[in-house]
Curated annotation (Swiss-Prot):
It comes from Meyerozyma guilliermondii (strain ATCC 6260 / CBS 566 / DSM 6381 / JCM 1539 / NBRC 10279 / NRRL Y-324) (Yeast). Interacts with NAR1. Gene3D superfamilies: YVTN repeat-like/Quinoprotein amine dehydrogenase. GO terms for cellular component: cytosolic [4Fe-4S] assembly targeting complex; nucleus. It is found in: Cytoplasm; Nucleus. This is Probable cytosolic iron-sulfur protein assembly protein 1. The gene is CIA1. WD repeats lie at residues 9-48, 55-107, 138-178, 185-224, 231-278, 303-342, 349-382.
């Protein structure tokens, strides 16, 4: 990999980074109690768009952009779905922020059907103000991760209190967040949660060395644990689903990659038919059970010498990247069904640990890998 740019984002640890699915925006969460948003433009040297602060009293441990409401091509005259960011903090609270779309008073607006394009340009060029939409309370201890589902209607949060909360909202208004489920499967601190990119399937990673998979019960709207993935011999710090659009994805299989204190990165899989929640299409013998069969598919080639904190799966290239306490970033590629290490970058943040990774796209549509470390830097890699 080649380092494109190092962004001095914070003066304290960076715990989390998240890239917007459509706009060239990157958000960070830091021990300095703030989140910064940057424009992913190499030609402009990755300028800061805004800093979100004065909301949390302790470290911001997790940030995640909400997926756009409609991920299809829209009419040019329709309004942009405003970028929306969720944060989780060690102060046990969540917050949700949204960019206020600038009003365009150009006289030629009616003659130029480029409303969305104009709004996008202003949002990423620091013309938009960011508004605090909600502060969400419920957890008893530090929030370790937040995640939006693919529809932007559910937010999952996990905590040191060993619980996972699922919050429901109207993605159009974000007026209120109602807790619809509290999941208590884990026996220890829950480190991470992530939704499947196209299904309401949730994965959680924990200090108890396991990964739990959740979905709604077949007979009602309650959420329940559908599978417990055992195999790691240490804390599971992070997991990521493979996107169905990934070049390596199978039409019949759903896969998940996980990273752990045991120095390993593992891939797990289940049948796609068993993961989908179309109850009417299932045989009556299966409808009565919410259980799923997940198997460990493989352990990726060894690349790390200390705990692995972050793992991400590219929907564009199908590559997996991992990073952690040893300061290394490893990139893996699957060829003819076999996973190989494509490259390892050592001392990617000098002597500092790496806490977070994200696959992102620049404003010129190039895919890059973004890393955040204890040094307060966001590094952009190609």
């Amino acid at each position: 990999m080649r380092l494109l740019y190092g962004i001095r984002a914070h003066h304290d640890k960076i715990w989390s980074v998240s890239s917007h699915q459509k706009l060239p925006l990157l958000a960070t969460g830091s021990s300095d109690k703030t989140s910064a948003i940057f424009r992913l433009s190499e030609t402009e040297k990755f300028p800061r768009v805004t800093t979100l602060d004065d909301t949390h009293t302790r470290s911001i441990r997790s940030v995640m952009f909400k997926p756009p409401i409609d991920d299809t091509v829209v009419d040019e005259n329709e309004l942009l779905d405003p970028p929306t960011l969720a944060m989780g903090s060690f102060d046990a609270k969540l917050s949700v922020w949204q960019a206020e779309l600038p009003q365009d008073n150009d006289e030629d607006m009616d003659q130029e059907p480029r409303e969305i394009w104009k709004q996008e340009r202003k949002v990423v060029e620091r013309a938009a103000q960011w508004e605090l939409m909600a502060v969400i309370e419920g957890h008893e201890h530090e929030v370790k991760a937040v995640a939006w589902n693919c529809h932007g209607s559910l937010v999952a949060s996990c905590s040191r209190d060993k619980t996972i909360w699922i919050w429901e909202t109207d993605p159009d208004t974000l007026e209120e967040f109602e807790c619809i489920s509290v999941l208590t499967e884990h026996q220890q601190d829950v480190k991470h949660v992530i939704w499947h990119p196209t299904q309401n399937l949730l994965a959680s990673s924990s200090y108890d060395d396991t990964i739990c998979i959740y979905r709604q019960e077949y007979d009602d709207d309650d959420w329940g644990c559908a599978a417990v993935l055992n195999g790691h011999q240490g804390t599971v710090w992070c997991s990521a689903f493979e996107h169905p659009k990934s070049p390596s994805a199978s039409e019949t299989t759903v896969r998940l990659v996980s990273a752990s204190d045991d120095l390993t990165v593992r891939i797990w899989s289940t049948s796609k038919e068993g993961s989908e929640t179309n109850h009417d299409a299932l045989p009556s013998s299966i409808k009565s059970s919410n259980e799923m069969q997940w198997d460990q598919e493989c352990i990726l080639p060894s690349a790390h010498t200390y705990p692995v904190y972050s793992v991400v799966w590219s929907s564009v290239s199908g590559r997996i990247a991992s990073a952690g306490a040893d300061g290394k970033i490893a990139v893996y590629k699957q060829t003819d069904g076999v996973w190989e290490i494509e490259g390892v970058t050592s001392a990617a943040h000098g002597v500092h640990e790496i806490n977070t990774l994200a696959w992102s796209k620049l404003d010129d549509n190039r895919e890059v890998l973004v890393s955040g470390g204890d040094d307060g830097y966001v590094n952009v890699w190609e």
